[in-house]
Amino acid sequence: MAGKELKQCQQQADEVTEIMLNNFDKVLERHGKLAELEQRSDQLLDMSSAFSKTTKTLAQQKRWENIRCRVYLGLAVAVGLLIILIVLLVVFLPSGGDSSKP
């Protein structure tokens, strides 16, 4: 009887050992996956930083482009108004000649 109980205890100990080894393998596998996830998250962080820098640079370029466009438009309007003013002055101001004297 003692031999049977000893055999049963040994079998249970072997089962526990096998379960513990399986758990250890799972822990190692999980550690590998966590390391991979950490590496991927670091890469994503680097990529997001680069993206943020690029968007700030692009926004600044677009802002200056918009300002430049407004300046050109303002200059075009000013030149157009100046031309209209010169034409009106030439047409409506009396000329230096005495064409109105009898």
Curated annotation (Swiss-Prot):
Signal peptide residues are: none
> What is this protein's expression induced by?
During myogenesis.
The domain of life is Eukaryota
Q: Which residues lie on this side of the membrane: Cytoplasmic?
A: 1-72
| Coiled coil spans | none
PROSITE patterns the record matches: SYNAPTOBREVIN (PS00417), V_SNARE (PS50892)
Q: A Gene Ontology CC term for this entry? A: cell surface
Question: Chief localization class?
Answer: membrane
Keywords in alphabetical order: Cell membrane, Coiled coil, Developmental protein, Differentiation, Golgi apparatus, Membrane, Myogenesis, Phosphoprotein, Transmembrane, Transmembrane helix
Please give the residue positions where the record annotates the modification Phosphoserine: S41, S48, S49
Q: Where is the protein found, in the record's own terms?
A: Cell membrane; Endomembrane system; Golgi apparatus, trans-Golgi network membrane
Give residue ranges for domain v-SNARE coiled-coil homology: 5-65
- Looking at the keywords, is Transmembrane present? yes
Q: Name one GO biological process term.
A: skeletal muscle tissue development
Matching entries from SUPFAM superfamilies are given as: SNARE fusion complex
Q: What single Pfam family name could you report for this chain, choosing any that match?
A: Synaptobrevin
The residue ranges for the Vesicular side of the membrane come to 94-102
- Identify the PANTHER family for this entry: VESICLE-ASSOCIATED MEMBRANE PROTEIN 5
Q: Which family does it belong to?
A: Belongs to the synaptobrevin family.
Question: Which function does this protein serve?
Answer: May participate in trafficking events that are associated with myogenesis, such as myoblast fusion and/or GLUT4 trafficking.
Protein name, please?
Answer: Vesicle-associated membrane protein 5
